């Protein structure tokens, strides 16, 4: 079996698998490979346990500006449309209601203004008053005593929307389709990349077991591991990494759909939200928490897996200065300490209950169950030159046949949009064709019309 490929993708999560499919379906590349360190695809950040299983299109994510929401909506549409085109309803993609709520007068005023801006972007977006929310999500309004909560509440959202996705199963489908299209493609599992070497006009991707695959172009979609690989080759040395791990709590099946809350604009992390679990029936997840930890991948044991690569990246004065500046802000400091407490046995559950009751006021301590083994690390990029935290996705384009992607949320939602960008870059670099018009026709006709 030949180990030479036009392109090799490092990382078998949903982003890597989306590019594997996109190159196979729409480009003239002959052979593409994925190398993945786990024994199965999509076992880390794309696992159904690692994320909130949400297609983040911007309609109920209150930290998105209208400008960002317009872009994210188009990205989300591609992912949703792919699943619907392939007939993956109720297997990969699920329909449910969803809403964002404001609790209290200040948040309600914010939500009213937000609705006026966002109803032009999202066709069919409905505004819900307290009574309508009670009809749609009774447990958001009813208190423990059966009496309606006293706070003013307003929201907006959709009564039905294809908003829930199992990104692990989506990853598997991308790969199945790609292998049908190009039988010479290859997937290498249990292939943990040790290093990447440039050899004349090709790259050698070398595993810890001394296996080698070769490619004219390498795309690194390895989540938290992308930046250490980049720095091992001399790229991205001006960047650091702040790994933020999210945890969840289970509660009984008390929500009919997704319920999001207003996010503090100072905080670069999602506000607590409620999501009926698409995989574990009868359970609703509340979360995520946000805990910084010295690890590129989450493990059950606190001391297990502390990352030497991370220490190499972050043990410098610029990163310490960024961390000091962040912690100097009282709201951020309190948020960090509060989330540390959430992880503690016994006391953490008691402290988290108050946050969870913002969504379901009748919740009791007995209703909360820490979701062991759920949640994963999201790499937040630190710019050492600008001395600040960079929110969102980060890409290192070398223009030398290798690109590195760091894709925290909403990276899974945007997987096909990111795959489009990467596939066009790869095809252009290799002198191959890419059928952009057919891509838009299949997955985003709106952009074709514009």
From Swiss-Prot:
InterPro entries: FAD/NAD-bd_sf, MQO. GO terms for cellular component: cytoplasm; plasma membrane. It is found in: Cell membrane. Its EC number is 1.1.5.4. The FAD is tightly bound. GO terms for molecular function: 2-hydroxyglutarate dehydrogenase activity; L-malate dehydrogenase (quinone) activity. It catalyses: (S)-malate + a quinone = a quinol + oxaloacetate. The keyword Cell membrane applies. Pathway: Carbohydrate metabolism; tricarboxylic acid cycle; oxaloacetate from (S)-malate (quinone route): step 1/1. It is a peripheral membrane protein. Keywords: Cell membrane, FAD, Flavoprotein, Membrane, Oxidoreductase, Tricarboxylic acid cycle. Its cofactor is FAD. GO terms for biological process: tricarboxylic acid cycle. It holds the Pfam family Mqo. SUPFAM superfamilies: FAD/NAD(P)-binding domain. Catalyzes oxidation of malate to oxaloacetate in the citric acid cycle. Donates electrons to quinones of the electron transfer chain. Belongs to the MQO family. This is Malate:quinone oxidoreductase. It comes from Helicobacter pylori (strain ATCC 700392 / 26695).
